[in-house]
Amino acid sequence: SYNSEELSLISHVEDIETHRTYSFEILSLYSLLKSGNKTKSIPQSYIPNTSIFDKIASLIRLNLFIPDSRIGWNYFAFKKAKKIITRNKIDYVITTGPPHSSHLIGQKIYDQFKLKWIVDLRDPWSELFYLKSRYRFNFSKKLNNLLESKVLENSDAIITTVGDRYHKILSSKVSNPKKIHKIYNGYDKFNFDKVPEKKPNKFNIVFTGVLSKNHNYEVFFEVLKIIS
């Protein structure tokens, strides 16, 4: 039920030991009911809300599956993780999200094994942009915030791809803000070593992320207008 798969990247990690498990994909059930095909992908960060079915599905998805609908993997992932940790001498565990439900796996591992735990937040959790534009019950918001607070507080380190304002928000949620660090997204330089340098007449700016009405990109266009 993931929208994009780049299977060619598997060759980059062939030397890394990988363990696969079963996962109960809640979104596969949505796809089956919606299109008759449970393998049909759902666009990232997209929650349709055009029909009665979509509205009900959105309400269920955001209020019953906390923190997200990928939580169907947690039972199987934790079961596998216990075997790996018991069999090997593991010192550190890193959980990355979204999906932020993966951090709940890390929480269970921390509770049982007391390993050093690093939480990697590729995107905000309770501040995730599409949560602001959808209706959620108060108990759903409180539970989501509670889970986030517990994960952040129990972790030994927190990594984000941005700093400044988001770090201020995170700092208010933990007793030790010094454990919050930023590591910017990077790229493999060798992929561009053989790309010839060009100086075209037109300059292209490409954004490959997600834009929504909750993002403030007006300043970008204002600056672009000034310098153009």
Task: Label each region the model flagged.
Residues 164-165, 183-186:
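Carbohydrate-associated surface elements
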Residues 2-75:
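A conserved catalytic-core segment of Leloir-type glycosyltransferases
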Residues 79, 101-104, 108-112, 125-126, ...:
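Membrane-proximal helix-turn-helix segments that form the acceptor-binding/catalytic region
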Residues 113-116, 156, 176-179:
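A short helix->loop->beta-strand "cap" motif at the edges of active sites that frequently abuts
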Residues 16-17, 92, 108-129:
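Active-site proximal beta-strand in glycosyltransferases
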Residues 188-194, 198-228:
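Conserved catalytic-core segment of nucleotide-activated headgroup transferases in glycan assembly
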Residues 48-51, 65, 77, 81-102, ...:
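Short N-terminal targeting/anchoring amphipathic segment
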